[in-house]
Design a protein with these regions (language model features):
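Phosphate-binding/catalytic loop of phosphoryl-transfer enzymes
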Residues: 272-274, 282-404, 413, 564-576
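Short beta-strand-loop/turn "lid" adjacent to the catalytic site in phosphate-handling enzymes
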Residues: 88-104, 234-307, 507-517
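ATP-binding/phosphotransfer module of carbohydrate and carboxylate kinases, centering on a glycine-rich
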Residues: 1-232, 249-250, 260, 265-266, ...
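Anionic group-transfer/hydrolysis microenvironments
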Residues: 180, 278, 336
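Proline-rich low-complexity regions
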Residues: 140-142, 278-280, 328
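Short alpha-helical interface elements
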Residues: 211, 241-246, 298-300, 343-344, ...
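Gly/Ser/Thr-rich beta-alpha loop segments that engage phosphate groups in nucleotides
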Residues: 183, 278, 367-371, 514
Length: 576
């Protein structure tokens, strides 16, 4: 079996991890391993695994990599404080493999890359709750005592709770902020009236300090507060100009400061802020620190990254300072915000009964965000870093490219063959280059043997994606296949998520730039349907606009629900 798999990998074929797990578990000669995870809250989960017997060095390396990927995905999805491996302690090959884990995952290092990324995240989460540092342990398989069956969350009247929550927006002035990898989208509301929206393009991966990351978010929130403090007819020209998408930060700052100075205490009108942030967020605190958004900070040797990133957890307090009275600020991961938004809209529809399964949603744009709202209305305190899962242990030629090369299957933040290079805009570039390099004419540059999308003097990443989506919707050449394949890759993530988390929900709601063109979503859905039997992919577009504010957004002529839906959902999330 292993020889055949390696031959396929050398031919640049993918070897999907969920299928490898299933095949190895069926192999009667494979050696069983149980991976028991102790989460940060003390609960435990078992993950069965099987390791096939190898015959040569190449096969041994492949089996080692398979186990590393299994461990990595468990920690990327769930995190935890201990992973105990139960296996035959009389098998020297397995003992030797176990002995490599501490080094490969860099337990003793301060600065980590690759597999060590999930250990850094576990450490930040542990420090936030006063827990111990992560560790590996081993035990003989014969000592394994099965865990009791986990309790099934009792379905709650989630639809009624969400409808009641959304009614709380009446009489309040609120702001929703959706932070992405290439832009920030905001929406402001006065009661059930949508006052304004704002889109600001940025490139946070290039920032070298936490202040560069926080300042635009805070300034743009102040801009929304200015708009709420004045009747629309009384907005000065400078404020209207600042709302334009192409308004630079210095112009926005001048408009905000002038408006704040003229209003004095009358600027104090903001009741709450909901913020969607593309990183691990637990208890309103941003705790991950390993996403591409903070790559520039991680590479800045002039700063202590851990100390700098810790200051980002103060974003909630900085936003609260912009609110009147006690205010209310709630922050969550972009995927969880997508799940909450979908649930709120479902609660106001004839399909509210679907909430009995809970809701899983993805935001698909620069990255892949994943969120999960359980049937009891809780958001699991899990990282859900599905964008960073290792999906493909094959495709050796594509893996050989540097992570910064658009042809590579390796994530830039970890150097590992991660899901981000199979979904989102990075996947669109990679697949377009593989299927027909001509699709990228005029958008790429070559430097040091690497191919990438030009980002200066003009950032062409978003225009390139728009170009590919337009070609795909028009049925031009290989462009449609780009998005069919991305849909198929999303199905692989779904299979791996089902294996790791066993959610009840049998639908996936999709938000983001990939949804705003119906023809592109249709292509994604084709690929997804072929690989995720029994699971529906549902677009979060105007058809999912049921709350008062989302209906108001759908009625706006120049913006779409697919683009600004999470910003509006963030408004309601501020009330949780």
């Amino acid at each position: 079996m292993l020889a055949e798999l390696l031959e396929r990998a050398r031919a640049d074929e993918p070897l999907w991890l969920p299928e490898l797990h299933a095949a190895f578990l069926r192999d009667e000669g494979a050696r069983p391993v149980i991976l028991r995870l102790t989460l940060h809250d003390g609960t435990q989960r078992d993950f069965p695994c099987a390791l096939p017997r190898w015959k040569n060095e190449e096969e041994r390396r492949f089996v080692y990599e398979f186990l590393y990927a299994a461990v990595y995905n468990i920690l990327a999805a769930c995190s935890g404080r201990e992973l105990r491996l139960f296996f035959d302690l009389q098998a020297p090959g397995l003992c030797a493999l176990y002995d490599t884990l501490g080094t490969v995952f860099q337990l003793g290092e301060k600065t980590r890359r690759g597999y060590g990324k999930v250990i850094s995240i576990a450490g930040r989460i542990a420090r936030s709750c006063g827990g111990p540092a992560f560790r590996f342990e081993r035990a003989d398989l014969r000592e394994l005592v099965p865990l009791p069956a986990p309790p099934v969350p009792a379905p709650a009247p989630l639809d009624a709770r969400l409808r009641t929550l959304c009614k709380k927006a009446r009489g309040l002035r609120l702001c929703g902020v959706d932070v992405g990898g290439t832009d920030i989208k905001l929406a402001a509301s006065d009661g059930e009236r949508l006052v304004c929206t704002k889109e600001y393009d940025w490139n946070p991966a290039a920032f070298t300090t936490v202040e560069e990351l926080m300042e635009p978010i805070l300034l743009l929130t102040r801009l929304m507060r200015c708009c709420l403090a004045l009747d629309t007819a009384a907005w000065p020209p400078s404020l209207r100009t600042a709302l334009r998408r192409d308004a630079p930060l210095p112009l926005i700052r001048r408009a905000v400061e002038e408006t704040e100075d003229s209003l004095g205490d009358r600027i104090d009108v903001l009741d709450g802020v909901g913020l969607s942030f593309p990183d691990i967020v637990i208890g309103d605190r941003i705790l991950g620190g390993e996403t591409p958004k903070t790559d520039g900070m991680r590479r800045n040797e002039a700063v202590d990254y851990e100390a700098a990133f810790a200051r980002l957890s103060g974003l909630k307090e900085a936003l609260l300072a912009l609110c009147r009275g006690e205010g209310r600020v709630h922050i969550t991961n972009d995927g969880n915000m997508a799940a909450f938004t979908a649930a709120a809209e479902l609660a106001h529809s004839a399909e509210a009964g679907r909430l009995r399964e809970g809701v899983i949603a993805h935001s698909l744009g620069t990255d892949l965000g994943t969120g999960w709202l359980r049937a009891d209305g809780t958001i699991p305190a899990l990282p859900l870093e599905m964008y960073d899962l290792i999906l493909d242990l094959g495709s050796f030629p594509s893996r050989a490219y540097a992570p910064e090369d658009l042809r590579s299957t390796r994530n830039a933040n970890s150097g590992l063959p991660g899901a981000l290079r199979y979904m989102g805009q990075a996947a669109a570039y990679r697949l377009a280059e593989r299927l027909d390099p001509g699709l990228l004419d005029g958008f790429t540059v070559q430097e040091g043997g690497m191919v990438r999308i030009a980002s200066s003097p003009r950032d062409l990443r978003k225009p390139c994606l728009e170009h590919l989506m337009a070609l795909a919707e028009a049925g031009e050449g290989a462009a449609p296949e780009v998005f069919r394949e991305i849909g198929g890759h999303l199905a692989v993530v779904t299979r791996e998520m089902d294996r790791l988390l066993q959610p009840q929900a049998k639908a996936r709601f999709l938000f983001g730039r990939f949804v705003k063109r119906p023809g592109v979503f249709a292509l994604l859905e084709q690929g997804f349907r072929a690989g995720a039997e029994g699971v529906r992919l549902i677009p979060s577009d105007e058809g999912l606009a049921n709350t008062p504010l989302m209906r108001a957004l759908a009625a706006e002529p120049d913006v779409t629900v697919a683009q600004f839906g999470q910003a509006v959902g963030s408004i309601y999330f501020s009330l949780t």
